[in-house]
């Protein structure tokens, strides 16, 4: 049975590193290194709001997933919560409900703590498993389009 909990940097770092490395290796559209990820992780650990929002999923005491969000304040003063893709190992991906459980927990945290009634979820068009989960959770393609440009 999968249980969710808060990320503890003292206890969970090594297990998260293993999951991160597997995730980066198998999700070709994400480019990062453990060093870059750990640097961001260390910043988030110092911010109570972000520290409490880092959710892990455990199966029989072993960490099998990790998820978080980023709060963005736009130039009009609107807060937007952006849920990132949940980190899992390839063999666990979408088979055990890890992603769904973590996303549901994050949505609940965002609603209760930040008092927001809308979240945005990052989903690659090429990732049909995540897109199916996002639709199962009732999310629809946003009218807010983001474009990317190399500079």
Residue ranges and their predicted role:
Residues 88, 94-108, 132, 136:
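Conserved acetyl-CoA-binding loop-helix of GNAT-fold acetyltransferases
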Residues 116-117, 140:
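Short acidic/polar active-site loop segments enriched in Thr and Asp
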Residues 6-10, 21-78, 84:
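Acetyl-CoA-dependent GNAT
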Residues 110-114:
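Hydrophobic pocket-lining residues that define ligand/cofactor binding sites across diverse proteins
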Residues 119-131:
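Conserved beta-strand-loop-alpha-helix junction that forms the acyl-donor binding cleft
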Residues 1-2:
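Extreme N-terminal starter segment of soluble prokaryotic enzymes
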Residues 86-89, 123:
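Hydrophobic adenine-recognition pocket in adenosine-nucleotide-binding enzymes
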